[in-house]
């Protein structure tokens, strides 16, 4: 039922083979124009198609949008024959309530055993595609990334689908969440994590201890990992375990260059 996409590029190839991808080669502006084109296209029957903007003003990096904007594309993203059956399976997992106490946890353990069968796999950094090009210090320039501004009254451009990786102060808990990031300048962003999110809870621990918190961000990950950034999982279940479950194979991770965290 499940298929493990190695990366976003492989998913794009499947979308194109299924007639679900529209390529735009004309130059487009990341400030308002991309979001306007998407908004009009998404109103078409069945949510239109996924759009790949290949020529974005000011950047050499293409932008994919509307990749999950229809039932068919969601089915393709998870390799599911029946999206309804697949979503019912997910619902049974994310609604699990983990009781207090050892025996209560043991009784419920069977319900999440399938999720825990697929732990992340740590790869050698030399084989990591996300570290083929590395910028350090003054080389860092976020304007190289085509971050879009969606609405006229937005405070600026926002990274809207970042996978944000953090860990607790004692290092025993990990979190991957999808939190919007406003780009302020070439090497500074804001982080919008709500008070009830794990990333915010971890940040509170570090602030109370007067310590800096390490954060890693992945952009353009595989479909399963992107979904898991928003999944309402049971307490204590690391999102990348769930990503492995959806993929049917442990998510491949690599240690970051400048922080003690791992990313896809």
Language-model segments: which ranges?
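Extended, highly charged
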Residues: 1-264
């Amino acid at each position: 039922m499940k298929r493990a996409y190695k990366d976003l590029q492989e998913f794009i190839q499947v979308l194109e083979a299924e007639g679900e991808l529209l390529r735009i080669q004309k130059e487009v502006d990341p400030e308002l124009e991309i979001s306007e084109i998407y908004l009009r296209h998404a109103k078409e029957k069945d949510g239109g198609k996924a759009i790949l903007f290949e020529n974005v003003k000011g950047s050499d990096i293409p932008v994919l949008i509307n990749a999950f904007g229809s039932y068919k594309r969601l089915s393709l993203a998870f390799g599911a024959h029946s999206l309804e059956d697949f979503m019912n399976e997910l619902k049974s997992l994310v609604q699990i309530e983990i009781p207090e106490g050892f025996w209560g946890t043991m009784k419920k353990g069977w319900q999440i055993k399938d999720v825990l069968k697929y732990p992340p796999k740590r790869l050698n950094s030399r084989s990591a595609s996300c570290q083929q090009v590395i910028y350090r210090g003054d080389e860092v320039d976020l304007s190289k990334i085509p971050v879009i501004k969606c609405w006229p009254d937005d405070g600026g451009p926002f990274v809207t689908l970042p996978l944000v990786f953090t860990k607790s102060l004692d290092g025993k808990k990990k979190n991957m969440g999808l939190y919007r990031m406003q780009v302020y300048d070439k090497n500074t962003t804001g982080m919008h994590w709500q008070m009830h999110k794990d990333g915010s809870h971890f940040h509170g621990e570090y602030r109370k201890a007067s310590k800096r918190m390490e954060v890693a961000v992945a952009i353009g990950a595989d479909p399963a990992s992107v979904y898991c950034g928003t999944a309402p999982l049971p307490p204590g279940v690391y999102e990348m375990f769930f990503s492995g479950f959806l993929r049917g194979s442990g998510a491949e991770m690599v240690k970051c260059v400048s922080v003690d965290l791992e990313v896809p």
